[in-house]
Amino acid sequence: MEIKDEETTAEVAMVVQSRFRRVCVFCGSSHGKKKIYQDAAIELGKELVARNIDLVYGGGSVGLMGLVSQAVHNGGRHVIGVIPKTLMPREISGETVGEVKAVSDMHQRKAEMARQSDAFIALPGGYGTLEELLEVIAWAQLGIHDKPVGLLNVDGYYNPLLSFIDKAVEEGFIRPSARHIIVLAPTPKELIEKLEEYSPQHEKVVSKMKWEMEQMSYPQNYDIPRPKEGKMIIEAQRGSRLWM
């Protein structure tokens, strides 16, 4: 009886408790030329499973997207794929895993992925991956969300991007504190450990609460009056836009 209790205790101890329920992974619809990229996608999926974290991703079954989603699904965790209807024939090959949410366009895809997730991780990818990554970084800087953003820098893949960001800081286009929005690591285990400990240190442009309040109060159709002649001024005290 004591041996059985010890085994049960050991099994419980192996379960890693995470602060995240779901993590969004951005990655390519291609495998890349190096096997190390594919290995990293599978390893990331297994690391999410080990921490009882569900996956939110771009919904494709090809490339790194297919590998990470299959690894999470095989491990028994829930998978949510968000994909525009137009991209389904291109990015879905064979059976999909988990739940697939079809949306109308790329804007809705990114918004839904962000809404469903507690953190973001970027694997190697192309233009689409970069766009998704940079948008959630920009949202963090603006104060729209306070979720961690992680960069899985497999084999130094993102070193040129990091050099560009450092150059932008040096030239005064990005605040030094905003450089730390990006959490960086070469392996999935190390990256998720860093994300678990992440706390925003950068100065936000606007508070998250302000964004949420504006979103709730903003009318669906808001027309700014535009007379034929005149110029717009901003009346700061009232927060209204006027033309004179």
Curated annotation (Swiss-Prot):
UniProt entry tagged with the keyword Amino-acid biosynthesis: no
Binding, substrate: 91, 109-110, 126-132
Presence of keyword Hydrolase: yes
GO CC, any one term: cytosol
BP term (GO), one: cytokinin biosynthetic process
E.C. no: 3.2.2.n1
GO molecular function, one term: cytokinin riboside 5'-monophosphate phosphoribohydrolase activity
Keywords: Cytokinin biosynthesis, Hydrolase
Reaction(s) catalysed (UniProt annotation): N(6)-(dimethylallyl)adenosine 5'-phosphate + H2O = N(6)-dimethylallyladenine + D-ribose 5-phosphate; 9-ribosyl-trans-zeatin 5'-phosphate + H2O = trans-zeatin + D-ribose 5-phosphate
Highest taxon in the source lineage: Eukaryota
UniProt similarity note: Belongs to the LOG family.
Its job: Cytokinin-activating enzyme working in the direct activation pathway. Phosphoribohydrolase that converts inactive cytokinin nucleotides to the biologically active free-base forms.
Name of the protein in its database record: Probable cytokinin riboside 5'-monophosphate phosphoribohydrolase LOGL2
Protein source organism: Oryza sativa subsp. japonica (Rice)
